[in-house]
């Protein structure tokens, strides 16, 4: 019998995360990369690397995240709701958690762990998320990491709207024109994210107890975390910053794959990937799409007529 690995993919709004665990559920490999809106191709590339790297293994695989459903359907692999994967990982790695605050590329969530789990998520607007931070950083001619470094030396906080990047820009640009310190503006941008998350998602429900910070922005931007910690008045053990916080949901998917997925060989995985790539080639090429339609339209028409005859009565 071939050795078995458990794989979780978190396909988010801007990134793909993969976690690979051995049979003892120890993490042996992780990867984190932007997909630039090309989710299926990025998932194919990540899984192709997996099949090559561990050619002599079998895999259980589960996909989760806002961009995972279509890829999971094409690959005929289990799709796990993100809140389920998050719950699974939280219960295993940080069971003392009462509330999760998670920021992604274009989404923000607060998850309350009580007698029942309640998730609150932003709508179509990406205000107060990683994309918002990217946009605001560009106004200061830097990137999110540079924004974080600037915020470490701030002295005051200015009010900045974060519901929409357009509104925020109208607040930030006058501050720049008036000569406000970039350090203060950077910290104010992070505070705007905090305000948007708490007011827009918590909607008056208290954030109490042990709070875990998940997602790429909160994993990499220490000053953003600090704005949350200060605003929520968190201290000591109430502050939970798990190791590899940006990968926790992918870890949950890997754990879920143990029960939700049948093991497949690397060769079978390669076949699934090739099938997805061929479907993508047809959908991306007008010529190939026409060829496919011409090849199958007669067959489809015959099937339709046959169904009509089979369903007829009298």
Which residues does each predicted region cover?
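Flexible inter-domain linker/hinge segments
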Residues: 1, 260-314
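Gly/Thr-rich phosphate-binding beta-strand-loop-beta motif of the actin/hexokinase/Hsp70
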Residues: 2-24, 97-114, 312-314
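Short glycine-rich, Thr/Ser-proximal phosphate-binding strand/loop in the N-terminal lobe
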Residues: 5-41, 45-48, 119, 123
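Glycine-rich phosphate-binding loop plus the immediately following alpha-helix
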Residues: 38, 115-156, 164, 246, ...
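Glycine-rich phosphate-binding loops at beta-strand->alpha-helix junctions
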Residues: 67, 203-231, 242-249
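Glycine-rich phosphate-binding/hydrolytic loop that grips phosphoryl groups
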Residues: 133-135, 241-279
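Adenine-nucleotide phosphate-binding core of ATP-dependent small-molecule kinases
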Residues: 168-199
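Phosphate/ATP-binding catalytic cores across multiple sugar-kinase/actin-like superfamilies
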Residues: 188-207, 253, 299-306
């Amino acid at each position: 019998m071939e050795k078995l690995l458990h794989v979780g993919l978190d396909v988010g709004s801007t990134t793909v995360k993969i976690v690979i665990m051995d049979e003892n559920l120890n993490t042996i490999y992780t990867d984190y990369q932007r997909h630039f809106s090309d989710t299926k191709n990025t998932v194919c590339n990540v899984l192709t690397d997996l099949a090559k790297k561990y050619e002599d293994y079998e895999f259980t695989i589960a996909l989760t995240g806002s961009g995972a459903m279509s890829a999971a359907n094409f690959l005929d692999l289990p799709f796990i709701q993100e809140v389920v994967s998050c719950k699974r990982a939280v219960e295993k790695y940080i069971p003392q958690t009462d509330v999760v605050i998670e920021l992604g590329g274009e989404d923000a969530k607060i998850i309350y762990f009580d007698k029942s789990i309640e998730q609150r998520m932003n709508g179509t607007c990406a205000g107060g998320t990683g994309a918002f931070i990217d946009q605001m950083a560009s106004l200061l001619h830097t990137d999110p990491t540079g924004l974080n470094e600037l915020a470490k030396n701030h002295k005051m906080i200015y009010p900045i709207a974060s519901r929409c990047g357009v509104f925020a820009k109208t607040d930030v640009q006058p501050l720049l024109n008036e000569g406000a310190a970039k350090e203060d503006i950077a910290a104010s941008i992070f505070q705007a994210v905090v305000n948007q998350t708490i007011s827009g998602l918590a909607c008056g429900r208290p954030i109490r107890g042990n709070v875990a910070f998940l997602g790429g922005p909160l994993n990499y931007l220490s000053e953003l975390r600090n704005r949350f910690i200060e605003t929520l008045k968190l201290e000591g053990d109430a502050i939970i910053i798990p190791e590899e916080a940006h990968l926790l949901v992918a870890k949950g998917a890997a754990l879920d794959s143990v029960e939700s997925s049948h093991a497949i060989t690397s060769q079978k995985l390669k076949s699934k990937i090739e099938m997805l790539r061929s479907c993508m080639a047809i959908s991306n090429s007008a010529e190939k799409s026409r060829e496919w339609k011409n090849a199958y339209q007669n067959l489809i028409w015959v099937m339709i007529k046959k169904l009509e005859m089979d369903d007829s009565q009298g």
